[in-house]
């Protein structure tokens, strides 16, 4: 029963994240000479939006999610391995870094850089020729975007280590055996003013983080993410999933995320108070009414998100109860 449950959950995970199976292994081939020619041409220096797409292997995705979840409320950090094909960045693998994280930031010390250099040297000895292509870190409970510190880190790396990608994962908002909350970003060159773009997809950001988000949101852009796997990945993916599945079954988002849930409700309360204050002081013009509707719409979306997350947490508990407790009752 547990094997069937794990297999079904893995299929659900692949469907929710739209992981595509590739029929050939061309994507895994690496041509060092061609890559060096690409680096020398530096097409990204002529177009700040040159890189538009990211392809992430299912193994790299699952390793990042497992690492992010292991950090709990603390931020974690790791590296991305891969290559570039035209305007697409392909992430083949990822590995964790030994860093000191807090609830709001993650700092890489000398030991982490030494570990990274040694890891990259050893992995090339095994025949893996992919290069470091970026970094990832977690934002537990407050969404996928770049803070001021993140923008600074990404900008420095793009200046000296191009091509370079930044990925953010929110393990708290990632639904067990469901869609991964993830974002891939690149910063603009200093002094560059991006064109006015249409409204991006709304995401809930805590009131305490909105200022940091708003100040820096025009300094970077997001890339479209897709996922892939090959037939060669399946065995390793199954083993990784079994470990992830055990952790999922042995934990409950309702209990493990109690502080996050409380924070969400408090944040929603503060946003409602803020909306009420602004509504009471606003004039009855058409422009003010549009602002009021936008503000109330965002609060409504945040409220719906909190409700959906709680329902999903309850459903996961019901699912676990039907697997274990009812099976034991039937046997007795």
Swiss-Prot record:
One of its GO terms (biological process) is regulation of cell cycle. InterPro entries: CSN5_C, JAMM/MPN+_dom, JAMM_MPN+_peptidase_M67A, MPN. Its main location: cytoplasm. Gene3D superfamilies: Cytidine Deaminase, domain 2. Its EC number is 3.4.-.-. Belongs to the peptidase M67A family. CSN5 subfamily. This is COP9 signalosome complex subunit 5.
